[in-house]
């Protein structure tokens, strides 16, 4: 199913399509992707949709939308697990032929009694059909794995270290249900083997499954992949991540204005790091990442750190791309925008992106440029427009109109020269000028504000405010 890679390393991300792509799942996908890239291997995606009742097309779409946004794409055809049911059944029959599986006709009532007895004796459940002659094949029954009754199963986990499980405590898990449907632990082993997966990197809530899956590998005489069980992500308070901690789905982080490269950087830092390096590129992460360096303790979601990291990547991002993202975000707010909103944002982004942590903040910083004339002036600004200040701003208006260029550097020179020629400090006209140009909205330094507005818009706003009032 999977072509050999130069190093032979194959990782996979195997989500269940029962909901959105959780931030924890996204980090698991990223770690698999990083390790595959680091080793020159392959990163594969398999949708574990054997639970047909809970799996939905909407969830599949949401998962891939999140992965696409993060830039994590499979290096091969995406596998949908339910389509491989015949292969899963084939392996179960091989296990039956090897004497490593058996048919079980236990009723629900018998199963409950057996559970209570096993619990009292401190062992896993064992079916009376384990070594009994087969019953009526036409009667409903399941097929169970026939695990060893003594000894231990060792899982050499790349993150947790060696973990041993007493076989007496591992139950004879069901491989095929009474309706013929394969179970999770069986399907995972068969698919990972057939896909050539060499490294199973997943959340540590799957650690107990590793022992059961190891026994199935061994029963089939298949090579056991390397396991790496990474810690879960907790909220800032150390509790399990939940809705009360804010966003959980990757799509929610996108809606909040985070950008993919910032999110990848932050997710990589959740449980892994490279010295004191906090902000880094994908290329650096690929070069440095090793799953063996992932820490054992749960990682905590830190909004301040996420904002800091995202801000660094936002500043380095292409202005045209940021303009498109900011315009799209502004349009979703439902507020009327000027016809030339794209051009206004394009002029403003270079002047304000240094102070923004997210795309939503970038839109806020562009708000002054998106106002339409005439601007409604704040009461504070109206009071600042004394007769003396109005006359001074009229003189400044003429100098601005005559400026050879209307870029931030030129405008800084014009403002300084004007203050000197007037013999006053900037405070004598700057606050009123800012109010006239922005309508009280947040804005950068005045030279940058005017450059973002353009000569025509800045002069027009000045003319509106300085015109004689009725």
Curated annotation (Swiss-Prot):
UniProt main location, coarse: cytoplasm
Motif range ('HIGH' region): 15-25
InterPro entries for the chain: aa-tRNA-synth_I_cd-bd (IPR045462), aa-tRNA-synth_I_codon-bd_sub2 (IPR020751), aa-tRNA-synth_I_CS (IPR001412), aa_tRNA-synth_I_cd-bd_sf (IPR008925), Glu-tRNA-ligase_bac/mito (IPR004527), Glu/Gln-tRNA-synth (IPR000924), Glu/Gln-tRNA-synth_Ib_cat-dom (IPR020058), GluQ/Sye (IPR049940)
The enzyme's E.C. designation: 6.1.1.17
Signal peptide span: none
Positions contributing to ATP binding: 243
Protein keywords: Aminoacyl-tRNA synthetase, ATP-binding, Cytoplasm, Ligase, Nucleotide-binding, Protein biosynthesis
Molecular function via GO: ATP binding; glutamate-tRNA ligase activity; tRNA binding; zinc ion binding
Alphabetical list of CDD domains matching this protein: GluRS_core (cd00808)
Keyword Chaperone: no
GO cellular component assignments: cytosol
Residue numbers covered by motif 'KMSKS' region: 240-244
Keyword Cytoplasm among UniProt keywords: yes
Reactions accelerated catalytically: tRNA(Glu) + L-glutamate + ATP = L-glutamyl-tRNA(Glu) + AMP + diphosphate
Entry-linked NCBIfam families: gltX_bact
Function statement: Catalyzes the attachment of glutamate to tRNA(Glu) in a two-step reaction: glutamate is first activated by ATP to form Glu-AMP and then transferred to the acceptor end of tRNA(Glu).
Family, similarity comment: Belongs to the class-I aminoacyl-tRNA synthetase family. Glutamate--tRNA ligase type 1 subfamily.
PANTHER family reported for this sequence: GLUTAMATE--TRNA LIGASE, GLUTAMATE--TRNA LIGASE, MITOCHONDRIAL-RELATED
Record note on quaternary structure: Monomer.
Name this protein carries in UniProt: Glutamate--tRNA ligase
Organism: Caulobacter vibrioides (strain ATCC 19089 / CIP 103742 / CB 15) (Caulobacter crescentus)
Gene: gltX
């Amino acid at each position: 199913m999977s072509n050999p890679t130069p190093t032979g390393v194959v990782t996979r991300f195997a989500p269940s399509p029962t909901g959105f792509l959780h931030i924890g799942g996204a980090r698991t996908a990223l770690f698999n992707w990083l390790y595959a890239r680091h080793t020159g291997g392959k990163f594969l995606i398999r949708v574990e949709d054997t639970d047909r009742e809970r799996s939905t097309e909407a969830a599949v779409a949401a998962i891939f939308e999140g992965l696409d946004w993060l830039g994590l794409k499979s290096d091969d055809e995406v596998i949908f697990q339910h389509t491989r049911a015949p292969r899963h059944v084939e392996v179960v029959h091989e296990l039956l032929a090897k004497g490593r599986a058996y048919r079980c006709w236990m009723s629900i009532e018998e199963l409950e009694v057996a559970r209570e007895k096993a619990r009292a004796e401190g062992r896993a459940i064992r079916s009376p059909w384990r070594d009994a002659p087969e019953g009526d094949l036409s009667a409903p029954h399941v097929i169970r794995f026939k695990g060893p009754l003594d000894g231990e199963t060792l899982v050499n986990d790349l993150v947790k270290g060696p973990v041993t499980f007493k076989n007496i405590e591992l139950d004879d898990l069901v491989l095929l249900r009474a309706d013929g449907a394969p179970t999770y632990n069986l399907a995972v082993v068969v698919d990972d083997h057939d896909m050539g997966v060499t490294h199973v990197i997943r959340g540590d809530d799957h650690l107990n499954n590793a022992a059961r899956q190891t026994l199935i590998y061994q029963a089939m005489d298949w090579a056991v992949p390397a396991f790496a069980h990474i810690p879960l992500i907790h909220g800032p308070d150390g509790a399990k991540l939940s809705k009360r901690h804010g966003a959980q789905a990757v799509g929610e982080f996108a809606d909040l204005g985070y950008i993919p490269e910032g999110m990848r950087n932050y997710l990589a830092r959740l449980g892994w790091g490279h010295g004191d390096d906090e902000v880094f590129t994908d290329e650096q992460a690929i070069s440095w990442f090793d799953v063996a360096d992932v820490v054992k303790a749960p990682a905590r979601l830190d909004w301040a750190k996420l904002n800091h990291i995202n801000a660094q990547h936002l500043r380095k991002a292409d202005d045209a791309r940021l303009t498109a993202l900011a315009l799209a975000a502004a349009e979703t707010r439902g507020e009327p925008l000027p016809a030339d909103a794209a051009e206004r944002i394009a002029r403003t982004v270079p002047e304000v992106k240094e102070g923004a942590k997210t795309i939503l903040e970038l839109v806020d910083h562009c708000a002054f440029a998106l106002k339409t004339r005439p601007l409604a002036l704040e009461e504070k600004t109206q009071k600042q427009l004394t007769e003396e200040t109005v006359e001074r701003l009229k003189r400044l208006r003429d100098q601005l109109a005559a400026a050879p260029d209307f870029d931030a550097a030129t405008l800084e020179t014009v403002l300084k020269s004007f203050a000197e020629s007037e013999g006053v400090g900037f405070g004598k006209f700057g606050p009123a000028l800012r109010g006239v140009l922005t309508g009280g909205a947040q804005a950068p330094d005045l030279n940058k504000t005017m450059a973002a507005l353009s000569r025509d818009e800045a002069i027009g706003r000045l003319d509106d405010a300085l015109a004689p009032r009725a």
